[in-house]
């Protein structure tokens, strides 16, 4: 039996001059083949006998494309749409003052959907202390915690030794950073996320003027702030982040529920960019 590994909706083979063909439904799966044929016209055919869910590591998933984090997810339904489209991270707002805030029980349901689809559930915290964040992360089965406000960021040096952390830096409209990450602990964070001054507002900042600080995390950095299907290609081309974060840019008319067509358009735009 010959075996291939499917990532990013295509099957990789150890052959030269083999063009990749996208197949829906095979994202993040190990695929076994019962028959593989190679004809003289260099066409290869195969029959799939079995597929198995796998969850690639962050650094593996981002090798041929920027990672995608879809945030402000408020239901298992929206999480399923995001995962099916190819999101790598599913973000949830655990902050009562956000219109996209959810309960811990709903967050747990979303985490389940995310994990089953090979994505990582992320909880966004703003003003919570260390103990509150840890309890919420355990209760909701979060993979990462995102520290967005000064209150939550104050617990970073302690949390980063207990949980996988996304640390948020905010930039004003001119692209100037408004806060810093503790340099002595920055390397312990999984990701640095650069957002606009008001996250989830749909407002961005000047990408051309922005300068990424010299501090580095384990995996790299994510870009957020005013990202949508029409401008994500430009944002990626200018700044070339390791991943992109979208929230309001894929929402429907109510600004809360996600729009399937916008999600699809967003993913298509991201996949059109190659560094």
From Swiss-Prot:
Its EC number is 5.3.1.24. Residues 1-32 form a transit peptide. It is found in: Plastid, Chloroplast. It catalyses: N-(5-phospho-beta-D-ribosyl)anthranilate = 1-(2-carboxyphenylamino)-1-deoxy-D-ribulose 5-phosphate. Pfam families: PRAI. Induction: By silver nitrate and UV irradiation. GO terms for cellular component: chloroplast. Belongs to the TrpF family. Catalyzes the conversion of 5-phosphoribosylanthranilate to l-(O-carboxyphenylamino)-l-deoxyribulose-5-phosphate, which is the third step of the tryptophan biosynthetic pathway. This is N-(5'-phosphoribosyl)anthranilate isomerase 1, chloroplastic. It comes from Arabidopsis thaliana.
């Amino acid at each position: 039996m010959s075996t291939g590994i499917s990532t990013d909706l295509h099957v990789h083979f150890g052959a030269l001059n083999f063009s990749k063909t996208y197949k829906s439904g095979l994202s993040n799966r190990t695929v076994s083949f019962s028959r593989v044929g190679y004809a003289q016209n260099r066409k290869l055919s195969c029959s799939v006998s079995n597929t198995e869910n796998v969850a690639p590591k962050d650094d593996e998933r981002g090798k041929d494309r920027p990672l995608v984090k879809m945030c402000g997810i408020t239901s298992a339904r929206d999480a399923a749409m995001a995962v099916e489209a190819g999101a790598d991270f599913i973000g949830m707002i655990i902050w009562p003052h956000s219109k996209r805030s959810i309960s811990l029980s709903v967050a747990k349901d979303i985490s389940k959907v995310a994990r089953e689809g090979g994505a990582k559930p992320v909880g966004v915290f703003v003003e919570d202390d260390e103990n509150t964040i840890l309890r919420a992360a355990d209760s909701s089965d979060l993979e990462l915690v995102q520290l967005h406000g000064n209150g939550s960021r104050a617990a970073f040096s302690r949390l980063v030794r207990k949980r996988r952390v996304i640390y948020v830096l905010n930039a004003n409209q001119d692209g100037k950073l408004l806060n810093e990450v503790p340099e002595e602990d920055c390397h312990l964070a999984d990701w640095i996320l650069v957002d606009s001054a008001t996250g989830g507002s749909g407002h961005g900042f000047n990408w051309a003027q922005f300068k990424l600080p010299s501090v580095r995390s384990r995996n790299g950095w994510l870009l957020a702030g005013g990202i949508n299907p029409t401008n994500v290609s430009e944002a990626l081309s200018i700044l070339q982040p390791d991943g992109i974060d979208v929230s309001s840019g894929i929402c429907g008319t109510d600004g809360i529920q996600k729009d399937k067509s916008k999600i699809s358009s967003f993913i298509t735009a991201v996949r059109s960019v190659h560094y």
